Amino acid sequence: MLSYSTHITHPNLPWVTFVHGAGGSSTIWYKQLRAFRKSFNVLLVDLRGHGKSKAPFYEKLKNYNFSTIGDEVLEVLDHLKIQRTHWVGISLGTIIIREITERNPHRTLSMIMGGAVMKLNKRGQVLMRTGAALKSVLPYMVLYRFFAWIIMPRKTHHEARNLFILEARKLYQREFKRWFTLVAEVNPLLKYFRFNDSNVPTLYIMGSQDHMFLPSIRKIVAFHQSALLHVIENCGHVVNIEQPEVFNNAAIKFLKQHSNNA
């Protein structure tokens, strides 16, 4: 089972499950925990190969797709007897949340999609294919640093960029390559998500400087009736770290509005 931690305020409060992105860990939510615990029970999960989810079992697994990763998260919920939860995700974690909800809509109360990845633009696709071709030649941290700079290029993004680089150093190289290959092949799944409304209350929280992903999210929100968009000014990709107070306020307000059926 994946490594996880729970923060239970009251048994009758709804749950919020946080899902980090590739190369991160549950520690990236340190600016959210105090605020969310006031109104919710909180579950933090380390995805396979990340944080403390590094048992040899995960190293040996050949099968690597978003459904398998989602099932591992659901295994934690089942273990804790959590029937329904709100989800909060960042970056590639939003793909996992959306995939879980697609197959198990009855488990989801609502979704907060921070720095959501729902389409790789042409530049992103070229970069991912180039990286996939070079991943067996270059040290994985060289690739990770490169992509961190591409996605978070400004000086104001340095805290988030440095945190993700620091967390990525803790990954096994084989694990990084598996995730990289997974992301390089994700476009068909993302296309399905863009053209199919989840019919679950969804709030996208994006930075105005998230040049690679914000344009596609604007189009999705215009098309999906269940989705809303909150753009944080002067903010990059990792919104929960760069502008935590704005992120927390917007997310908590939205979650409270959709907690009646918890």
Identify the role of each PLM range.
Residues 89-93, 97:
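Gly/Ala-rich beta-loop-alpha elbow adjacent to hydrolase catalytic centers
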Residues 102, 108-138:
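Flexible "cap/lid" loop of the alpha/beta hydrolase fold
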Residues 225-262:
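Catalytic active-site module of serine/aspartate enzymes centered on a nucleophile-bearing elbow/loop
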Residues 34, 43-88, 249:
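Active-site loop/oxyanion-hole signature of alpha/beta-hydrolase fold enzymes
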Residues 5-58:
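Conserved HGGG/HGGXW glycine-rich cap/lid loop of the alpha/beta-hydrolase fold
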Residues 201-235, 241:
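Conserved loop-alpha-helix segment in the C-terminal half of the alpha/beta-hydrolase fold
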Residues 1-17, 38-41, 78, 83, ...:
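Alpha/beta-hydrolase fold catalytic core
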Residues 122-124, 141-196:
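Conserved alpha/beta-hydrolase catalytic His-Asp/Glu region
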